[in-house]
C-alpha cells in the first residue's frame, strides 16, 4: 500500500500539469519578481497547482516521521467586473506512523475554501468565504468521518515596488455531526506569512501554520511553529514555477506532536 501511495503522489504532478506544460504561454509581460509576489497572494488572479510536502519529525508516541504531501489547486473565477471567487482545495496524501511500529498510507480529509475577493484591490487585499472539510480519508487513522464547515478570511498587503508581502490566513472548522468515526471536532488554523523579494524572483519567506484543537485540554491545544526559508521563481520551458524550501520548529506542541517540520513546495503557475 505504501509503494502504491507514493507512486501515485509522484505521478500526480505530471498528470495534473502535463497538459499545461505543453501549451503554457510565455507570460513575458510578468517579470520574475512580479511572479513571485503573485504567488505570495492567496487570492491573486492566478491558476496554480502547488505540491507542498511536509515532513514532520519526531511525531507520535514513538517519535517517528510523518509525511504529508498536500496537493493544492487554486482556481480563480470572475463573477463580475468587481468580484472574483478564488477556490482553494487541499488534498493530503499521508504516510502515518502507527503506535504498533507499523505505518499506514493514503488520502486524508480534503479541505475546500471559496474566497470572495475584490477584482481590483488596492495595496490592502482581502478575501472571505466558507471552508468545508470533506471526509475523503481512506482509513480512520488518516482523518474524521464527519463533515465540517466554518468561515475563512485572508488579508494581506502587496504594493508594486515594495519588496514586502505580508498578511495572514485564518479559518475555523466545526464538525457538522459527532456520529461518524473520530467524533466531533473544532479546529482553528492561523497562517501568518511574510515575504521579502529580491530581484530575479528570489525571496525569503516565513509562513508557519499555527493550529488550535479547541476540544483538547489547554496544555495539548496549540501547535505553534517558528522558522522560515527561501524561494525562487524559475521556468520549465514557458511555464513559471515557484520552488520553496523552509524549516519550522514547534515552540509549542501537544505531547505527541512533532518538534520539527521540513517543507518543500513546487507550485506550477498559470497567470491569466
Predicted segments with their positions:
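Cleavable N-terminal export/targeting peptides
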Residues: 1-32, 272
Amino acid at each position: 500500500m505504501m509503494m502504491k501511495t507514493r507512486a501515485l503522489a509522484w505521478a500526480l504532478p505530471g498528470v495534473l500539469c502535463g497538459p499545461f506544460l505543453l501549451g503554457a504561454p510565455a507570460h513575458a509581460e510578468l517579470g520574475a519578481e512580479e511572479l513571485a509576489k503573485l504567488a505570495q497572494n492567496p487570492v491573486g488572479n492566478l491558476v496554480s497547482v502547488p505540491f507542498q510536502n511536509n515532513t514532520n519529525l519526531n511525531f507520535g508516541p514513538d517519535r517517528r516521521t510523518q509525511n504529508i504531501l498536500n496537493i493544492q489547486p487554486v482556481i480563480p473565477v470572475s463573477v463580475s467586473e468587481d468580484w472574483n471567487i478564488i477556490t482553494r482545495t487541499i488534498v493530503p496524501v499521508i504516510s502515518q506512523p502507527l503506535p504498533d511500529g507499523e505505518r499506514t498510507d493514503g488520502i486524508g480529509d480534503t479541505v475546500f475554501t471559496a474566497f470572495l475577493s475584490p477584482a481590483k484591490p488596492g495595496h490592502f487585499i482581502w478575501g472571505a468565504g466558507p471552508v468545508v472539510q470533506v471526509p475523503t480519508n481512506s482509513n480512520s487513522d488518516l482523518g474524521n468521518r464527519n463533515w465540517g464547515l466554518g468561515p475563512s478570511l485572508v488579508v494581506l498587503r502587496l504594493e508594486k515596488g515594495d519588496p514586502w508581502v505580508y498578511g495572514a490566513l485564518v479559518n475555523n472548522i466545526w464538525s457538522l455531526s459527532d456520529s461518524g468515526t473520530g467524533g466531533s471536532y473544532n479546529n482553528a488554523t492561523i497562517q501568518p506569512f511574510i515575504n521579502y523579494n529580491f530581484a530575479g524572483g528570489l525571496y525569503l519567506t516565513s509562513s508557519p501554520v499555527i493550529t488550535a484543537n479547541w476540544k483538547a485540554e489547554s496544555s495539548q491545544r496549540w501547535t505553534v511553529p517558528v522558522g522560515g526559508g527561501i524561494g525562487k521563481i524559475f521556468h520549465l520551458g514557458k511555464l513559471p514555477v515557484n520552488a520553496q524550501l523552509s524549516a519550522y520548529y514547534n515552540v509549542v506542541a501537544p505531547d505527541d506532536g512533532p518538534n520539527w517540520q521540513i517543507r518543500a513546495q513546487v507550485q506550477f503557475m498559470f497567470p491569466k
